Amino acid sequence: MGMTMTQKILAAHAGLEAVKAGQLIEANLDLVLGNDITTPVAVNEFKKFGTDKVFSKSQIAIVPDHFTPNKDIKAAEQVKYIREFAQNMEIENFFEVGEMGIEHCLLPEKGLVVAGDVVIGADSHTCTYGALGAFSTGIGSTDMAAGMATGKCWFKVPSALKFVLKNKPAKWISGKDIILHIIGMIGVDGALYKSMEFVGDGLQYLSMDDRFTMANMAIEAGGKNGIFPVDDKTEEYLKDHASREWKVYEADEDAEYDKVFEIDLSELRPTVSFPHLPDNTRTIDNTGDVAIDQVVIGSCTNGRISDLRMARDILKGKKVKKGIRCIVIPGTQKIYLQAIKEGIVTDLVEAGAAFSTPTCGPCLGGHMGILAKGERCVSTTNRNFVGRMGHVESEVYLASPAVAAASALTGKITDPELV
């Protein structure tokens, strides 16, 4: 039996000719990632190894993004601690405020992840880089520490689910709608410890930003990783961004999949995930009359330039409904600058939105838009658990930038076609 794309990448990095689902392996790492929340714990564990150096100064990335710019004294102390560690270890890829971005937007932009890589990150949405044809997955701070010390990590080789995407997406359908549809279909544990492998002729219509969004939310279905084959769009992106050579892996024709799903993108409708799990989805036609208090457009899921363009296209020349808060957060400084050059920032601010420096901020209930008791938010983020963005009695509705922007105009969950 042949191997899936994920299995081929893992086999190569383990120095093996072949692997099979369930097999335990030790693989060489191309990149180890941490942020301001997870890295302090990893540093504490790293110090127990008794080594005075990391395995590679260039293959570790530390991105303070969750509580930055520092939201309080504790946040400042955490970043100071990991900044000093990075300086002492001469880690090349420590990204300070002013040069940083949300980690999963920043690393592809900097070319630090390329096709064929094996990447671990002490953040669950590290699976984002599967959009580039890499195997990337979230791990805990202890594994991050071991990775920084040894350049290796152990894995159980995952089995796979295959998603065959067919036809051109219907109007307003983005990567966010597709992945919410999939999660709603299979459930938050539907891909538990499996690779989610996306294929099909529908890929030609999906931008890299769409793919980043979809791979990002593989974890919300329980997936070990999400991954896309390398095609012309991937190659074009890598040529523009990659800092080193990449390698293309393709699934064998006789690769084994636990299940194959066919999805006709032309039949999808904008999709919203209701509280309090990402799989509690409804199409925009079945959302009912849900009044909201806040809209957030941004995050590692939807903070890229195409997302901001979509929000601008809907909000330009209009006004956010009185009493509604609309917060827009670009994924990186480069995206921020591009939004300035294109007039997006001006258009959004004139519409009544607040525009922020890059940060994870409200996504995890950190800062920059916390919800009070009883408040509702339409957000382009990736999780809507109880208390995720603030008070335990607040509610988060996950949606695309188009639905979020339309909802900001009306003060309720709204089909973008209607504004």
UniProtKB/Swiss-Prot annotation:
Enzyme kind, highest EC tier: lyase
InterPro entries: Acnase/IPM_dHydase_lsu_aba_1/3, Acoase/IPM_deHydtase_lsu_aba, Aconitase_4Fe-4S_BS, Aconitase_4Fe-4S_dom, HAcnase/IPMdehydase_lsu_prok, Homoacnase/IPMdehydase_lsu, IPM_dehydratase_rel_enz, IPMI_cat
EC numbers for this chain: 4.2.1.33
A Pfam family it matches: Aconitase
GO molecular-function terms, A-Z: 3-isopropylmalate dehydratase activity; 4 iron, 4 sulfur cluster binding; metal ion binding
Cofactor: [4Fe-4S] cluster
Keyword field: 4Fe-4S, Amino-acid biosynthesis, Branched-chain amino acid biosynthesis, Iron, Iron-sulfur, Leucine biosynthesis, Lyase, Metal-binding
Cofactor note: Binds 1 [4Fe-4S] cluster per subunit.
Metabolic or biological pathway, per its Swiss-Prot or TrEMBL entry: Amino-acid biosynthesis; L-leucine biosynthesis; L-leucine from 3-methyl-2-oxobutanoate: step 2/4
Superkingdom in the source lineage: Bacteria
Reaction(s) catalysed (UniProt annotation): (2R,3S)-3-isopropylmalate = (2S)-2-isopropylmalate
An annotated GO BP: L-leucine biosynthetic process
Record's keyword annotation contains Signal: no
Family indicated by similarity: Belongs to the aconitase/IPM isomerase family. LeuC type 2 subfamily.
Record's subunit section: Heterodimer of LeuC and LeuD.
Protein name as it appears in the record: 3-isopropylmalate dehydratase large subunit
